[in-house]
């Protein structure tokens, strides 16, 4: 293959790469996780978040990772897939009464940015743990 053909192939590859980058940039959106649950729940209740884009459209069929940390730093991990309304739900169980921090993370896609939410949660089943 002569040098003119090689240069032509390289130019075509560069143009395709620029067009792909432009398309992805023009169609990319930021995402946001919004907590819909109360700050005080009990075992058996559900912790619910909704995933939305920058236009406030809900985002279905995406995985949200949850990490619930107690006061001592011990973590319980869950994941849930958003439904047709953008809601991801985790049913809480076997958590002692007390304060927790919930980290909710969406890892994004090629068209949606990664997002996370950190929220406080209090588990109160109506009894003392001692």
Where are these regions (language model features)?
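Surface-exposed, short loops/turns at beta-strand junctions within beta-sandwich domains
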Residues: 93-98
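Extracellular interdomain linker/stem segments of modular secreted and single-pass surface proteins
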Residues: 29-30, 122-130
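Short flexible loop/turn segments that cap and initiate beta-strands
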Residues: 54-79
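Beta-strand-rich structural segments
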Residues: 37-56, 68, 104
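Enriched for extracellular/lumenal, surface-exposed ectodomains of secreted and cell-surface proteins
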Residues: 100-119
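Glycine-centered loop-to-beta-strand initiation motif
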Residues: 76-78, 82-90
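Secretory targeting signatures
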Residues: 1-29
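Ser/Thr/Pro/Gly-rich low-complexity linker/stalk segments immediately outside membranes or between
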Residues: 24-40
């Amino acid at each position: 293959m002569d040098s003119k053909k090689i240069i032509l192939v390289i130019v075509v590859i560069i143009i395709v790469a620029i067009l792909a980058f432009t398309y992805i940039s023009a169609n990319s959106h930021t995402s946001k996780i919004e907590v819909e649950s109360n700050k005080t729940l009990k075992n058996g209740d559900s912790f619910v978040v909704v995933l939305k884009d920058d236009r406030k459209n809900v985002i279905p069929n995406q995985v949200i990772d949850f990490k619930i940390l107690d006061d001592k730093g011990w973590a319980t991990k869950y994941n849930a897939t958003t439904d047709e309304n953008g809601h991801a739900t985790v049913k809480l169980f076997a958590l002692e009464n007390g304060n927790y921090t919930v980290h909710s993370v969406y890892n994004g896609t090629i068209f949606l940015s990664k997002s996370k939410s950190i929220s406080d949660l209090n588990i109160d089943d109506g009894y003392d743990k001692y």
